[in-house]
């Protein structure tokens, strides 16, 4: 009861068109009127004295398409929490494609975003097959380079690398642990999470269900393999 959790969808669109995605996207950014309404709602909640913690989750679509909203609202949230002596924390679920080194620094230092969930669907081949850019382009190398820049920083954060697992990329996901994954293996800020791709809904793409679903839950087996290989695992 002392925790107020707020999930904010900064933008209705996404720069990816993943083959298994369930969302229907609209190219709509958050209006200043909606931002003002969120601030007013938050003021009323925080000044009630009921809360000691505020947790904000930035979501989408792709939330970094609405980076201006994060940039405008975060300082207001932080100031309100300081005023009412409330602990503030913030998280973002992002595909990481737009998260440049500069934006990451701002999110971490200025806006107190210290928790990140980023998806890599195996190695370069399998990821680029499942997680396609809106324009049909490839995404793995840029995301991986951005993740490496994150790892090379000195900031405090937790980054969950999520793998959506299908029959098509199962082997590639396993091989990530002995190839590209070694960059993050000894860094406790990075944690791995596995999820079977399910029948999540058609979304708005004809290419939906171009992946073959697994007939078993692979998350436990893959998590066990990651732990025995020396990786840190995210709690469910």
For the regions a language model picked out, list residue spans one by one.
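Short, conserved phosphate-binding/catalytic loop or strand-edge motifs used
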Residues: 54, 124-125
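Non-cysteine beta-strand/loop elements that form the S-adenosyl-L-methionine
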Residues: 104, 108, 112-124, 189-197
């Amino acid at each position: 009861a002392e925790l107020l959790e707020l999930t904010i969808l900064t933008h209705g669109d996404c720069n990816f068109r993943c083959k298994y995605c369930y969302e229907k996207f609209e190219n709509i950014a958050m209006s200043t009127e909606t931002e003002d309404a969120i601030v007013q709602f938050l003021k009323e909640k925080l000044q009630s004295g009921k809360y000691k913690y505020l947790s904000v989750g930035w979501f989408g679509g792709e939330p970094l398409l609405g980076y201006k909203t994060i940039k405008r609202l975060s300082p207001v949230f932080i100031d309100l929490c300081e005023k009412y002596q409330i602990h503030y924390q913030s998280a973002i679920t992002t595909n990481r494609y737009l998260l440049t080194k500069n934006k990451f620094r701002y999110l971490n230092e200025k806006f107190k975003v210290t928790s990140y969930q980023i998806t890599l669907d195996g190695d370069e081949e399998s990821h680029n097959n499942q997680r396609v850019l809106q324009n049909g382009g490839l995404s793995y190398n840029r995301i991986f380079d951005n993740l490496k820049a994150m790892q090379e920083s000195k900031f405090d954060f937790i980054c969950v690398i999520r793998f959506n697992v299908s029959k098509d990329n199962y082997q590639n996901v396993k091989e990530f642990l002995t190839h590209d994954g070694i960059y993050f293996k000894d860094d406790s800020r990075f944690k791995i999470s596995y999820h079977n791709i399910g029948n999540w809904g058609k979304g708005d793409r004809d290419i939906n269900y171009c992946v073959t679903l697994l007939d078993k839950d692979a998350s436990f087996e893959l998590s066990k393999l990651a732990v025995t290989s020396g990786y840190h695992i995210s709690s469910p």
